[in-house]
Amino acid sequence: KIFDEAVEAALLPYQELIWKLTEKTKELYPKKEYPQTIVIDTETTGLDPFRDELLQVSIIDEDGNVLFDSYFKPLKHKEWSKAESVNHISPKMVADAPYINEKAAELYAILSQAHWIIGYNVDFDLRFLMGSDIITDEEYNAFRTEDVMIQFAEIYGEYSVYHEDYKWQKLTTAAAYYDYDWNVKGIEAHNSLADCFATLFVYHKILSEE
């Protein structure tokens, strides 16, 4: 912990510079129209949006067209073994990937035009985007979201007495419930782009049952 705090302190001046440059690139990014309804998913080095970092962000529209998909090289983390065991993204895989700030303007252009954001535990994804200075607190709170995980939890019906609510289920469970074929897109499960397609599929299935 002491080592981590020392590293963060040493990086702070550079992080502030990166943040200023990121804000400037947002202003200068060419204007382009993006869909108002999007599906988003992320992969990260851990669960803390203000200490961990993004490894991949993927965004598709409601018709399944890919709007954004990129891996990222973390600025602070050199390894993330626990997260890697789940998302299968190794340090070697992202060694030559861009840093998040290099894609910040493009990401922001898509998010700033979105009126409706669909995701599986979408709050997790948006908090990481906020923690990476892609969106502000105000923008985060203003987004209209559709959390497929919450919707599916009630459909699946596994009730938690402790939480007095329906238990959240993994995306793989939701996909299996609706017989989703992960191979249809030829992308490995837990890749954030694959998760976007699976989330959209489950979302459409839920809508068709209403």
Q: Residue spans of the language-model regions?
A:
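Conserved non-catalytic scaffold segment of RNase H-like nuclease domains
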Residues: 10-137, 142, 165-180, 184, ...
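Short alpha-helix plus adjacent loop in nuclease-associated cores
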Residues: 146-166
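Substrate-binding/catalytic groove segments of enzymes
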Residues: 158-159, 181-184, 209
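Acidic, divalent-metal-coordinating active-site segment for phosphoryl/phosphodiester hydrolysis
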Residues: 191-202
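Short, hydrophobic alpha-helical segments
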Residues: 204-210
